[in-house]
């Protein structure tokens, strides 16, 4: 039976543990934005003491906006866990996987991740490199949409016919009619 644990941090940050694979999602950020929390010094200290936030296999950022990504905290994490794979949609570190194609795949022991380029919500962010992913491990499938435009056809293409067991989505997916209709399909 597949085992999945989700541990939330601040804003869109989460740790997804599927079987024995630990994936950090938009977890490290320090810039506070209006109405959203961030990873301040106290939360950073508590995260370092919590097993759920230790030893990531994969560190993935959907995009590099400062409310989702901190280069400084990411660099610190890579020093603590040098074996972690880092995946970003733009070049930030010498040792990283840079997403650039419409769809890309990464295989880890016991887990596969299919990344897809998705439009960021809001016309003002049309040029922002932004990716979501479908994570499959041990018969369990999770969807990470980041700040994807609600009801995006590109997200539907990324999912295809794959049954989704868990979807981590921004609140407009539930509160706005197009998001709810998309989820029902």
Indicate where each model-derived feature is located.
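Flexible, charged surface loops at secondary-structure boundaries
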Residues: 1, 17, 51-55, 79-82, ...
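Pre-active-site segment of Zn-dependent metallo-hydrolases
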Residues: 21-60, 72-76, 150-161
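Short, charged, surface-exposed secondary-structure boundary motifs
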Residues: 34-36, 94-98, 108-111, 124-125, ...
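Active-site HxH/HxHxD metal-binding segment of metal-dependent hydrolases
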Residues: 46-106
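Cap/insert and terminal regions of metallo-dependent hydrolase folds
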Residues: 152-185
């Amino acid at each position: 039976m597949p085992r999945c644990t989700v541990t939330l941090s601040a804003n869109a940050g989460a740790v997804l543990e599927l079987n024995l694979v630990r994936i950090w999602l938009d977890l490290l950020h320090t810039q506070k934005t209006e109405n959203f929390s961030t990873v301040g010094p106290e939360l950073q200290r508590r995260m370092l003491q919590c097993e759920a936030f230790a030893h990531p296999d994969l560190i993935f950022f959907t995009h590099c906006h400062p409310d989702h990504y901190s280069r400084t905290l990411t660099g610190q994490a890579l020093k603590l866990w040098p074996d972690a794979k880092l995946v970003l949609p733009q070049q930030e570190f010498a040792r990283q996987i840079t997403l650039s194609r419409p769809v890309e795949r990464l295989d880890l022991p016991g887990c596969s991740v299919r990344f897809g380029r998705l439009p960021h919500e809001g016309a003002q962010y049309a040029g922002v490199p932004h990716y979501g992913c479908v994570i499959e491990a041990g018969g369990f499938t999770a969807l990470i949409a980041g700040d994807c435009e609600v009801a995006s056809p590109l997200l539907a293409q990324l999912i295809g016919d794959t049954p989704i067991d868990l979807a981590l989505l921004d609140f407009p997916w539930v509160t706005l009619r197009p998001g709810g209709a998309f989820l029902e399909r």
